[in-house]
Each structure stands twice: as C-alpha cells, then as structure tokens.
C-alpha cells in the first residue's frame, strides 16, 4: 500500500471576530492533513491551541513525523498509540476515517453499531460583546434551534 501525505495550513477570517472570556479571535488558522491512496483522498483538519502548548509549526511537525508510517499504511488503531492526543492526532485520525469511508472500506453507521445518522441539534454561540451587538447577533440567528 502506498499513500501520499500532504500537510497544509489555511487561514480563515472570522466575520466580526469571535470573543469568549479568554480573548477574541479574528481568524482561524487550520492545519489540514490529506492522505491520498489509489485516487481517493481522505482529509482531516485541526486548530492548534496555545492553551495546550500547540502551535501551527508543532502540529505540522508532529504530522510529518508520522509520514513514513502513514505512507506505509498505518491505520487508526496504530495511530492511537503512535501519537499523543491533541490537534495533530485529530487531523490524522479524521483523514484516516475519511479515507477509509471514501474508499468503501468502512460504513460508519455499521461500524458504530448505529442506524443511519439523523439530524442533530447543535448550539450556536453568540460572540461576547456589547449588549446591542449581542442582541443583533441573536436576532440574525433566531432561526437556529439553540443559541448560547
């Protein structure tokens, strides 16, 4: 088995910024891991968090350090013991899941012992700010099922 590994960074602006008690973000820097095998590509991504000692460079280095093993066919089970939990392992794990599903090796519903997925309600977080701005955000997102 031969796989190709690609690691890239992307930067996405956050419209209006996003604020929580720890600070404000104006953009998201994302590390993307892509595994290509027999014309099929699996993709995973992560956001390194300084709070956990992660940087863009440290995450890229951690993923690239697994390059030879991933190219040789490392699977998800091996990955769990080969890399510590964190952003880098998350990106690689997601890429492996995506690759296996797209290659037809896995049916996620069957694998998880579940029926076909159903829509799931999630919360939309209103960015911390001035009361008027928060009220406007809430009004703009009033059709969402759950605001926090």
Specify the residue positions occupied by each region the protein language model found.
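N-terminal capping/lid subdomain adjacent to the active-site entrance of alpha/beta enzymes
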Residues: 1-148
């Amino acid at each position: 088995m031969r796989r190709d590994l690609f690691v890239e960074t992307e930067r996405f602006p956050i419209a209006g910024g996003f604020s929580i008690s720890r600070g404000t973000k104006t953009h998201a820097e994302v590390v993307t891991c892509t595994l290509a095998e027999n014309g099929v590509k699996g993709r995973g991504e992560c956001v390194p968090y300084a709070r956990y000692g992660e940087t863009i460079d440290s995450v890229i280095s951690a993923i690239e350090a697994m390059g030879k093993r991933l190219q040789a066919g490392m699977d998800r089970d091996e990955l769990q013991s080969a890399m510590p939990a964190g952003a880098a392992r998350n990106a690689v794990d997601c890429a492996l899941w995506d690759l296996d599903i797209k290659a037809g090796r896995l049916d996620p519903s069957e694998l998880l012992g579940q029926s076909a997925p159903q829509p799931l309600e999630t919360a939309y977080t209103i960015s911390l700010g001035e009361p008027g701005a928060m009220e406007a955000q809430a009004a703009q997102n009033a059709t969402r099922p759950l605001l926090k």
